[in-house]
């Protein structure tokens, strides 16, 4: 077969093969292009035969070769478009949407368990006549420590325990500074002060299952005339019963806080076992829940309140601890990791 006939045969067979390729034959199309038009393809092999032709025939066949190459190149380009279009259409068909189907129900958000706990606690205090007072998270050393009867050399002022921004500015380690500022402003001629101050506080703790460098506290303060330890105990009993049930009881253990004197740790009878002893209460029947005490006279005097005429009590509890006890949560880090699987349990 002469070279011209071979060129015609190559053109015809290639065009026929191209027509059979669809959207499922992208690789086959590329392989065919290389086999025909590639550097080692069929057309290149035929070109090698030009040297054996006569001088008269060589230009004629050379022109035919170029025409065949141009024709096949264009044919491959057109078929590639067809193959790609067919591929896209097949994908669209496979992913078609039935517009008559009902839409998916929108996922509803809900309050975080800490928000729920905080609101429940605040509602309890509002019902008892307390006012809610917010304060600064970035606080002065003076209000955070000195006004709370914490002298310069107190261990709690150590850099290991507190996030200092400057020597005089820090991230508050408790919400007590709000109480100091409120004491400065309160007009006792209009009645006693009853307040709680909820909010985030910060400590230089290593995060683990029971510790976090930030957590939430709610601290309470009552100051007026003839406020006694009996008032503190009665208030705490009412709070605990509203939080954990009317059958709960409390006990007070001696403790120490620089800003209260006397100071107590407050335990609640275990709501899991009813005081019989279990893993939650560590077999004691009691769970440590908060710290409290009578406001130290120095704290009152620094606010210009006559400690001989006025007295008061203060208490503080951690909202994470309350939530962990109420819902059986054993790792404080779950509150902050944003895992919806954790959060939706409390919806």
UniProtKB/Swiss-Prot annotation:
It comes from Streptococcus pyogenes serotype M18 (strain MGAS8232). Binds 2 magnesium ions per tetramer. Its main location: cytoplasm. It is an enzyme of class 6 (ligase). Mg(2+) binds at residue 261. This is Phenylalanine--tRNA ligase alpha subunit. GO terms for biological process: phenylalanyl-tRNA aminoacylation. Its cofactor is Mg(2+). NCBIfam families: pheS. GO terms for cellular component: cytoplasm. It catalyses: tRNA(Phe) + L-phenylalanine + ATP = L-phenylalanyl-tRNA(Phe) + AMP + diphosphate + H(+). The keyword Protein biosynthesis applies.
